[in-house]
Amino acid sequence: TEEALQDINTASELADLIELRLDYINNIKVSDIETLIKAKARPVIATCRPKREGGRFTGSEDKRVALLERATDSGAEYVDIEHDVERSLINKFRKKAGTKIIVSYHNFSETPADAELKEIHQKLAGTGADVVKIVAFARNITDNLRIFSFLEGVRTPTIAFCMGELGQISRILAPKYGSFLSFASLEKGKESAPGQLSAKELLNVYNFRRINRATDIYGLIGNPVAHSMGPLLHNTCLREEGLNAVYLPFKVEDLPSFINGFKTLNVRGYSVTIPHKVTIMGLLDKLDPLVESIGAVNTVVNRDGKLVGYNTDSTAAVKVIEDGLAKDGDTLHGKKVTIVGAGGAARAVAFGLKQKGAGITIVNRTESRAETLAGDLKCQYKKFGELDKLNTAILINCTSIGMHPNIDDIPVPANVLRPGMLVFDAVYNPPETRLLREAAVRGCRTLDGVKMFVLQAAQQFELWTGRPAPLEHLERIVRTKLAGTQ
Ligand code: NAP
């Protein structure tokens, strides 16, 4: 009870309503309830969820009803009652003046089909509920679409969303589709259902209070997406530019059905990450010419319903290097560039630099991949073992060597680094890799991967909105976040 009192206090600073989960309070006594309800500075929903509906209450039904009754008698504005209780219990609470009834249905294994959702809603609304609550579980990201279209068709105040990581977007978009409320945890680790975001994340990352029916949607397509910095960066840009839009994480397994299904939401733009950068090309209406040569898309723009693919990894890397050279009045044209790596990042960087007239050499551990990329670029390639004879003006690391946690690894022998060489590392975690440290000691100019990472996001934002992104602010966010993960 003591801990609950503290939590009520904290919750009052974040939330519009507080759900008091009586089933989460150990050994709760009926007499404690009045103390808890009286402490509220916000309207309260009293819930005492039994195990059968996914809660923790294992006591008798009489005790459960007694706890809820004491809560409503003490002034709880809402009481949440499960759909499968005796109708007489619902009627009992309906007679209590000043208390509204939420009749709830939970499905922890799937999202019911459209017709079934309507049927459940009709049944719950028929009990005389003030608010109907239908909570499903998302097995696929497209399950959220059923919830959105269902919400748009109901008249009774209704709470509806999907649980689970794949259902998080339905919690964030609750105000857009008219859900009566959305639940958030008090802090990370205090979730009362799978997929719940913390209140601070909902408010500070997703700008929840700004979301309404007219809010545009952007998002990141990938798998996994849970640790991406994209939502923080893009939602910061959207807020600072005063745009009515939100950027969401889309964890996508089946890409074709996602792209097709989400057309109904008219998503304004996507970032694309592993593992979908190549496969998405075949699902778009148009590709930027640079994308056709690189063979990968990291950005999609919705232009009047047509999806157009771009690659800002490429343009961002080129800009970072050009800006680095420009400090000494230099340009890329005719420069000798060695790229270590032949994966997705190397392809994007190499094609961008080639367009600017650089002379490129590819070096990669798996020689056949170096040969293929060099063939596509019509440039030279070398064996990994030949790196000790390096003769280049610009050296770029596009491998994951040196990336957290293997921070002592270096992609080239340190003695090949010469004064005046420009060394760019695409790795951004950590920002200062061993390669960059050794390069600085030997008098090279250095550029880190954070600049590219921030710029590729900023260029996406510009492609979507036509507005410049707040670059310095974004760079600060990324560097602070990365400093916290070391
Ligand atoms: P990828 O497609 O998987 O390619 C990985 C590359 O690293 C391949 O060339 C691979 O060589 C090489 N590699 C990996 N481990 C190695 C090792 N132990 N020894 C030698 N070579 C090794 O990955 P990617 O998407 O190109 O990403 C590469 C790096 O760039 C990652 O660290 C990523 O974080 C970074 N990146 C940064 C940005 C940014 O905005 N700053 C953007 C994109 C990527 P093999 O061909 O022999 O396997």
Spell out what each predicted region is.
Residues 18, 356-377:
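NAD(P)-binding Rossmann-fold cofactor-contacting core
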Residues 37, 44-90, 279-332:
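Glycine/small-residue-rich loop that forms an oxyanion/phosphate-binding "nest" at active or ligand-binding sites
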Residues 162, 218-225, 309-314, 321, ...:
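Glycine-rich adenosine-cofactor-binding loop
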Residues 84-216:
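Catalytic alpha/beta core domains of metabolic enzymes, predominantly
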Residues 375-446:
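Rossmann-like adenosine-cofactor binding region
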Residues 330, 334, 419-422, 426-486:
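Adenosine-phosphate binding glycine-rich loop
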Residues 1-115, 129, 136:
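Active-site beta->alpha loop and helix N-cap motifs at the rims of alpha/beta catalytic domains
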Residues 215-327:
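Phosphate/diphosphate ligand-binding glycine-rich loop within oxidoreductases
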